[in-house]
């Protein structure tokens, strides 16, 4: 999914579930508003807080793509079929100066 489409859908309250597979520390430093932190290792161990509905549309994004690709593959193994990667990943999202949320310290 392109960043511009995701942003438009976030703003119109039609956003897919946004999965951020980075570590909790990285996630707290900043993420797409509304994203769910589901580190790859937690997905692998089936311990991530994922939606129960495996048909929900999901967009997966990490900083450069490696963990997003792994997360997408693991989610497919667990039966999540409606998943997409964010084009340009979080690096592209930040370069485009799109909304970015940080955890409260």
Where are the model-predicted features located?
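Rhodanese-like catalytic fold shared by cysteine-dependent sulfurtransferases
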Residues: 1-17, 24-57, 63-105
